[in-house]
């Protein structure tokens, strides 16, 4: 079982690649010793969506900003200034990734990407899975032997290519 006192913090090597809001949010999260799950429960969002917000990869609503201000004890005006714009997605880390867990996810796409594509094309036709009309979640499973397994669900709207 994971130690519940451990929380994810901001890797200092990423700070220059992330918006200023990331530093603000992560520092407040660490000060309060909050998990993404606990923040997500307060916001009514998934923990992955909240983590993406902290990394500047998703947009905060006015309600998110108000609740984050309360949860993290950060002035609402500061969060409005830092989170009020549009996210600059996809620039958080180097490509290919060097962080081992992120590299494993990249490796999954490298190894199974064409297999996923072939199966999805057979099931849905010619098109793509949206990463905009999209949701994801991470769950923990424990098997009969006590081994922990990570279960990542990716759910994206199917978008058929247009014929023109």
From Swiss-Prot:
InterPro entries xrefs: Cyanase, Cyanate_lyase_C, Cyanate_lyase_C_sf, Lambda_DNA-bd_dom_sf
Protein's name in the database: Cyanate hydratase
EC number: 4.2.1.104
Alphabetized NCBIfam families for the sequence: cynS (TIGR00673)
Record function comment: Catalyzes the reaction of cyanate with bicarbonate to produce ammonia and carbon dioxide.
GO biological process, one term: cyanate metabolic process
Pfam families with a match to the protein in the record: Cyanate_lyase (PF02560)
Gene3D superfamilies: Cyanate lyase, C-terminal domain (3.30.1160.10), lambda repressor-like DNA-binding domains (1.10.260.40)
Catalytic activity: cyanate + hydrogencarbonate + 3 H(+) = NH4(+) + 2 CO2
UniProt keywords, alphabetically: Lyase
């Amino acid at each position: 079982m994971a130690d519940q006192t451990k929380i994810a913090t901001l890797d200092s090597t990423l700070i220059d690649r992330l918006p200023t809001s990331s530093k603000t949010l992560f520092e407040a999260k660490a000060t309060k010793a909050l998990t993404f799950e606990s923040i997500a429960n307060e916001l009514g969002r998934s923990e992955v969506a909240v983590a993406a917000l902290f990394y500047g990869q998703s947009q905060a609503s006015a309600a998110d900003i108000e609740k984050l201000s309360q949860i993290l004890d950060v002035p609402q005006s500061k969060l409005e200034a830092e989170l009020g714009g549009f996210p600059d997605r996809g620039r958080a880390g180097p490509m290919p990734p060097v962080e081992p867990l992120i590299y494993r996810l990249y490796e999954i796409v490298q190894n199974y990407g064409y297999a996923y594509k072939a199966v999805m094309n057979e099931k849905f036709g010619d098109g793509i899975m949206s990463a905009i009309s999209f949701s994801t979640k991470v769950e923990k499973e424990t098997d009969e032997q006590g081994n922990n397994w990570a279960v990542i669900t990716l759910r994206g709207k199917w978008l058929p290519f247009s014929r023109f």
